[in-house]
């Protein structure tokens, strides 16, 4: 049987770190130990509480391929924002409201903004919690410290597989990690350096939703509950 293991680290009421694995029973102890240590050692500050939750996987595990990776040459934050602008224009979207929202995400959210691209309206039921893309892992994950790139690619690949999500934008909430991305099924994973300045206390992600009102629940259920294993080649 497979198990979902999730870690959440907090300082007071502030979320500072989260990570997860999907493992077989024989690998549970090692995964739990690695996630606990990771929760205690995070650039957002020391954790006052680390919670590790273990649940059996009860749905069939879906295997998907990782998105292809593209890495444009970017020299500074202005050029990074220009890359995002061009990606959004390529989807026939007005970049301004999307990017203004992205760069205003300063209070840590456990999840993402779910943005209806038709009316530029936020759809997440709880704006403080957001919509969480969870219950996923990737092949070859040995839990040897944090791998920003692989973990981001894993999450982006799962999100892009959702029929109602046409794109995702992300800035890491780690203050010293300045690489973000744009991702979609059409464009793949566009890795963008200098998306923010080192030390900036901002970060978050936006899922771009296009669909019917009745499909919101289906979309959120897939993102939060469908177990997914992302197949990655050696990167």
Curated annotation (Swiss-Prot):
HAMAP family: BioW. Keywords: ATP-binding, Biotin biosynthesis, Ligase, Magnesium, Nucleotide-binding. It comes from Desulfovibrio desulfuricans (strain ATCC 27774 / DSM 6949 / MB). The gene is bioW. The lineage of its organism: Bacteria, Pseudomonadati, Thermodesulfobacteriota, Desulfovibrionia, Desulfovibrionales. Catalyzes the transformation of pimelate into pimeloyl-CoA with concomitant hydrolysis of ATP to AMP. One of its GO terms (molecular function) is 6-carboxyhexanoate-CoA ligase activity. Pfam families: BioW. Homodimer. Its cofactor is Mg(2+). Its EC number is 6.2.1.14. Coiled coil: none annotated. Pathway: Metabolic intermediate metabolism; pimeloyl-CoA biosynthesis; pimeloyl-CoA from pimelate: step 1/1. It is an enzyme of class 6 (ligase). It comes from the Bacteria. GO terms for biological process: biotin biosynthetic process. It catalyses: heptanedioate + ATP + CoA = 6-carboxyhexanoyl-CoA + AMP + diphosphate. InterPro entries: BioW. Belongs to the BioW family. This is 6-carboxyhexanoate--CoA ligase.
